[in-house]
Regions:
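Glycoside hydrolase catalytic-domain context in secreted enzymes
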Residues: 19-317
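Bacterial Sec-dependent N-terminal signal peptides
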Residues: 1-28
């Protein structure tokens, strides 16, 4: 399995930086005043293969299966610097060994990001997000996310694919339990709260050992799948997008969320993963989001059956 990052996450974060909510300016969590210069110097040293590698996520060996499996021997790729991030790595020993390999044997010594679906707790398990939302208590949601971040980061996981902030109004959809329900206002409050819980109140809080990157998913209208069938198409107007489905994502962005995830569905016949409207016009130009975007599980590969790419190589372009 692999997810392809639309922007090189590992490269950016390995030099201790973050994207601010402004347009075009970068901020270092550690206060580094020369961060753009340092990033440019690393980029100048990278081969095309290394750049592509840093934009690619593989799955660590795990008993957890959440989609199609691609069995890949990651160690040779790791030594070449061709892995930007790993999914499903939850063992502190395995994470340490992987990171040591990347830092000792890859040419540019770029650390690996370790990601996991920390949805409603890591070791300590909390109520599912839908149940938690019934309390109408944003502070409680923030506290549970903060505890989960502390536990996950303690073993080396530094990126969670949460919160899921999809508005869902059809109980037949199989992922209603992962979000906050049908109300955009409540969804927005809890979206921002969970981002603060995972990441902290300020950008520099991500330097803390008990915080991790959050990811607002799935952009957008994934919960509006027709007939509640997962991965199905959606039929929503731009007004519905802006009034109902966008607000929790905008709240996450305003709370400083570091990453966004694409959605499997299509909107107006265009797969979200390849939507210029969503990711350039709205996310980048309108909202001025300068973080990075990750595709959902094999979503780029699925652009082929969507009919917008002739093959997987074309889809990756």
């Amino acid at each position: 399995m692999k997810k392809k990052l639309l922007i090189g996450a590992a490269l950016i974060l390995s030099v201790g930086t973050a994207c601010t909510s402004g347009a075009g300016d970068w901020q270092s969590y550690s206060g580094d005043k020369r961060i753009e210069e340092r990033v440019d110097s690393v980029l100048a040293l990278m081969t095309l293969e290394e750049k592509i590698g840093q934009m690619t996520q593989y799955s660590a060996k795990s008993d957890i299966v959440t989609g199609p499996q691609v069995n890949t021997d990651i160690e040779p790729l790791l030594k070449k610097g061709y892995i930007g991030s790993l999914f499903h790595a939850t063992s502190s020993a395995a994470i340490r060994k992987t990171q040591e390999t990347a830092l000792a044997e890859s040419r540019l010594k770029i650390p690996v990001l370790f990601a996991f679906d920390v949805i409603h707790g890591f070791k300590t398990i909390f109520p599912i997000p839908l149940a938690e939302s019934c309390a109408w208590d944003a502070e409680l949601a923030e506290r549970s996310a903060s505890i989960a971040a502390a536990e996950a980061s303690a073993v080396g996981v530094n990126w969670t694919f949460a919160p899921m902030v999809d508005i869902s109004r059809d109980a037949r959809w199989g992922r209603v339990m992962e979000g906050s329900g049908e109300d955009p206002y409540l969804g927005s409050l809890l979206s921002a709260a969970r981002v603060r819980g995972f990441q902290g109140e300020k950008p520099e809080d991500l330097m803390r050992l008990d915080k991790m990157l959050a990811c607002a998913k799935h952009f957008c209208a994934y919960g509006a799948a027709e007939a509640g069938r997962d991965y199905n198409t959606t039929d929503v107007s731009e007004r519905s997008l802006r009034d109902i489905y966008f607000p929790p994502f905008k709240a996450a962005k305003d709370a400083g969320v570091a990453t966004f995830m694409t959605a499997f569905n299509e909107i107006s016949g265009v797969p979200c993963t390849s939507s210029k409207f969503l990711y350039q016009d709205v996310l980048r130009d309108e909202w001025r989001f300068n973080g990075f975007v990750v595709t959902d599980y094999t979503a780029i590969n699925e652009l082929v059956p969507h009919g917008v790419a002739r093959d997987e190589a074309h889809a990756a372009e």
